Amino acid sequence: MARKAKKKNISSGVAHIHSSNQNTIITFTDEKGNVIAWSSSGKVGFKGTKKKTSFAASEAAKDAAQMAKEHGISQVRVEMKGLGSGKDSARKQIEVWGIKVTEIKDVTPIPHNGTRPPKRVLKRLRLKK
């Protein structure tokens, strides 16, 4: 059984929103990167294709924001990553829970002609043209 986390008094932190095609994960950290609270669409109770919806992302953000509020977080810097549909709804839900958003940053990694993609990805890219 995991031990209960101590209540921390942290006024500001970073909210990381990772939104993929299948799931949305929200993590609240302090400025150093230590995790304070986290939640995901799957943790909240959504299964299968329902995890990728924006409603599931907002419910996960509500759960994570509630835990972060208990640790004293009042303002965050939001870093969003990924191409999923739940990024904006998760950010809005964080604001609804009374946590002030000071900065919004998109940190989605974009390759600048890196390694060659697998054959199936190349086929998909050719079909789109």
From Swiss-Prot:
Biased composition (Basic residues): 117-129
GO molecular function terms noted in the UniProt entry: rRNA binding; structural constituent of ribosome
CC annotations in GO: ribonucleoprotein complex; ribosome
Domain of life: Bacteria
Chain intervals for the UniProt region annotation (Disordered): 108-129
Pfam families recorded: Ribosomal_S11
GO terms of biological process kind: translation
Coiled-coil regions listed: none
Keywords: Ribonucleoprotein, Ribosomal protein, RNA-binding, rRNA-binding
Binding partners and assembly: Part of the 30S ribosomal subunit. Interacts with proteins S7 and S18. Binds to IF-3.
Physiological role: Located on the platform of the 30S subunit, it bridges several disparate RNA helices of the 16S rRNA. Forms part of the Shine-Dalgarno cleft in the 70S ribosome.
Annotated HAMAP family: Ribosomal_uS11 (MF_01310)
Sequence similarity: Belongs to the universal ribosomal protein uS11 family.
Protein's name according to its UniProt entry: Small ribosomal subunit protein uS11
Source organism of the structure: Mycoplasmopsis synoviae (strain 53) (Mycoplasma synoviae)
Gene: rpsK
